[in-house]
Amino acid sequence: MTRILLLGLDPETVDFSDPALPPGMNAEKVRAAIAVALKQFTERGWESDLCFIRPDETAGTTVERQLASTAYDCVVIGAGVRLPPRGLPLFEAVINAVRKAAPDATIAFNTRPDDSADAAARGLALRSRTV
């Protein structure tokens, strides 16, 4: 069965005042949208896991630990990890941890939590063309 990892910042650690993030978002809205994404994964017949990271030096280790526990076909990295320019070191740590711990998984990016299933579908399509 296809397995997806949705990887994002713990909503309680996000600075929603950052202009690089979509306006009007808050932790409650992010959690609700993540619930939608997880439901959409199930509706598409995919198993999924959610991994929250913190914007600190533990992020890479957290990602590697999660990826060591299960083989994933696609890792969807949330917009909160990649969008804020000041978060570039975090984004780099996450990408390198995924590449190291799950070299066979495709990497996909959402624009908001509730379009994660579409991001995973794009990633899985790439996987089917390269496997």
What are the residue ranges of the model-derived segments?
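N-terminal, charge-rich interaction modules
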Residues: 1-20
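Short beta->alpha junction loops
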Residues: 49-58, 110-113
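Structural motif
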Residues: 57-64, 117-118
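Short catalytic helix/loop segments, enriched in acidic residues and glycine
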Residues: 21-39
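A generic structural motif
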Residues: 42-48
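Mid-chain, well-packed structural core segment of small domains
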Residues: 61-99
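Ser/Thr/Gly-rich flexible loops in soluble cytosolic domains mediating phosphotransfer, phosphorylation
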Residues: 31-34, 93-130
